Amino acid sequence: MACRQRGGSWSPSGWFNAGWSTYRSISLFFALVTSGNSIDVSQLVNPAFPGTVTCDEREITVEFPSSPGTKKWHASVVDPLGLDMPNCTYILDPEKLTLRATYDNCTRRVHGGHQMTIRVMNNSAALRHGAVMYQFFCPAMQVEETQGLSASTICQKDFMSFSLPRVFSGLADDSKGTKVQMGWSIEVGDGARAKTLTLPEAMKEGFSLLIDNHRMTFHVPFNATGVTHYVQGNSHLYMVSLKLTFISPGQKVIFSSQAICAPDPVTCNATHMTLTIPEFPGKLKSVSFENQNIDVSQLHDNGIDLEATNGMKLHFSKTLLKTKLSEKCLLHQFYLASLKLTFLLRPETVSMVIYPECLCESPVSIVTGELCTQDGFMDVEVYSYQTQPALDLGTLRVGNSSCQPVFEAQSQGLVRFHIPLNGCGTRYKFEDDKVVYENEIHALWTDFPPSKISRDSEFRMTVKCSYSRNDMLLNINVESLTPPVASVKLGPFTLILQSYPDNSYQQPYGENEYPLVRFLRQPIYMEVRVLNRDDPNIKLVLDDCWATSTMDPDSFPQWNVVVDGCAYDLDNYQTTFHPVGSSVTHPDHYQRFDMKAFAFVSEAHVLSSLVYFHCSALICNRLSPDSPLCSVTCPVSSRHRRATGATEAEKMTVSLPGPILLLSDDSSFRGVGSSDLKASGSSGEKSRSETGEEVGSRGAMDTKGHKTAGDVGSKAVAAVAAFAGVVATLGFIYYLYEKRTVSNH
């Protein structure tokens, strides 16, 4: 006979005390091989019933044996006296040879269950003549019918236990005087993995069965055979399918149960209580607490948020919880009296009842010791791993103020506080011969009072330090003359000069990519910027930028690119400055420009070797510019800027990480001739008109932006050559004159 039990909750006492329960369905199969009481009304005999009776949760099913004479009999439900029951509705199926009747109107309530009487009569005989009556007993199927027992599973630390009603007095193994040996067998697991054990075998593997007058209690350890373990992170769930079979003379009882157990405690913070369950085949159907049954679709409207990614997390607003005073806690404790979670599982409904409690609301730790410094501070360090999940160090504050740490290293998970004894909410008190100073470091929640889910770890740490009374600090005001105004000067700055592939300025060239190769008239994009500064009131201003043939920025010859913060106005292709957009945090910390690659010449020779670039710059105060270069407007008289510019000590010089190799388009110095060496003249104009383009060149300059002696020398050579030509011409004319004079004579 198959019996299904459903029940409420039961809190066992004594060794059964536990804080977690799993509510699950139980199926009890009870096959009656013989009835307990068979009566022939006419003959008063008790023949054994040859069929099978099955007790379900709602009805009784009687199965008659198949024999050649079965079509000649008739069966009906009657009362114990053999009289018809007019309110009883039953179904007699001659084809299947079954009779089905409900408990409500077709049975009589007896102690521990239901009693039903049927009458079987041969159709060929006279009415009631030769009729046989059989009485059957079915145990109470509902848990509430069995003296208040509960079908809930209790979760202990290492095992789960559940109770079943004791439906017959002979179920216990205490009938040693009987000739027939009764026994239990246990089937653990589901499907092909199911394993059947005798009771002694199960006891050896850690199972246990306890039977008293009203109930049977079965213990299943978490590591037993057939128990499925689901784990995800730090959360665990155990699930098991069981069949307990008891065989006794004339009857066979099978209890079938499926149980789930989640033994992990809940976690709590300032706003919510969180229950975590790992991923398993069950699907949440409803949540019940405080006489409320809430469907999963209505959880959010009732202050519960469901997070169904990677398992399941239920976040209960603390406004739903109760509070109580506990001997274990200094402050009040949040809890729920009971919480039932109902799941759809294979394909039955399985419920789990738990009793969640938050841990005590007390400070995480109290730090004492030699923390007080001689200058009146407390120094303390806080690490992110002091809570689980890790602490968000950016939310830490001291006392009732906004005092923040003096040092923070997120990569190391460390912050350091330097707490003044006379500030940041520090309190003091006298204890014996000591003065004790106390403060609290805590994390703040932006959503308190609760308005959203907060998964931040709660952190409160009390820090204390003390002085001896004899060493107590004294505050003394010493009047003195007003000190002179300090001379303010900016501290050291670090600049960097880099080159970029294009004007997007996304990624600079690395040091291992130098020397860079550039062809004539190809732009070279450069950037100067300030490193490791977050001050929005400073501004980077270029002074000069120039090129040299060696890595020494002071070497000669030099070729100017930027002079006094402006493009060099003697170039054929002038330097172009690029604005710095909002893509960077502090645009005033950058200067960007590009120059066109030219053939660099010195002393009438074109240099095709490596060229090094350098820049000098200074840092200006945007709020109070202290140098004319801080507010340059181009073009401006170079002489005027030089006269009022910054001193050399205020400037900083930076260089590119490596040189640039300047080549012509065909990797030779095509188009570069003597005409290119002349600063002006018809030959230069003729060259440009014949070729239709300008082949740029730069003459070497001194540091003031003027032509160097090498270029002046080339002009002198040209002048001497011209003078020699004139002398030769005059000599040739004189020669012709003398020759004509001789011939005339």
From Swiss-Prot:
One family name in Pfam for this protein: Ig_ZP2
Gene3D superfamilies: Zona pellucida, ZP-C domain (2.60.40.4100), Zona pellucida, ZP-N domain (2.60.40.3210)
Extracellular side of membrane: 39-716
Membrane-related topology note: Single-pass type I membrane protein
Cytoplasmic compartment segments: 737-745
Record key words, sorted: Cell membrane, Cleavage on pair of basic residues, Disulfide bond, Extracellular matrix, Fertilization, Glycoprotein, Membrane, Receptor, Secreted, Signal, Transmembrane, Transmembrane helix
SMART domains per the UniProt record, alphabetical: ZP (SM00241)
Residue intervals of the ZP domain: 371-637
Proregion span(s): 641-745
Disulfide bonds: 55-138, 88-106, 372-465, 403-424, 545-615, 566-634, 620-630
Taxonomic superkingdom: Eukaryota
Entry GO MF terms: acrosin binding; coreceptor activity; identical protein binding; structural constituent of egg coat
Glycosylated residues in this chain: 105, 122, 462
Expression by tissue: Expressed in occytes(at protein level).
PANTHER family, per database record: ZONA PELLUCIDA SPERM-BINDING PROTEIN, ZONA PELLUCIDA SPERM-BINDING PROTEIN 2
Disease entry from the Swiss-Prot or TrEMBL record: Oocyte/zygote/embryo maturation arrest 6: An autosomal recessive infertility disorder characterized by oocyte fertilization failure, due to defective sperm-binding to an abnormally thin zona pellucida in patient oocytes.
Quaternary context: Can form homopolymers that assemble into long fibers (in vitro). Polymers of ZP2 and ZP3 organized into long filaments cross-linked by ZP1 homodimers. Interacts with ZP3.
Record's protein name: Zona pellucida sperm-binding protein 2
Organism: Homo sapiens
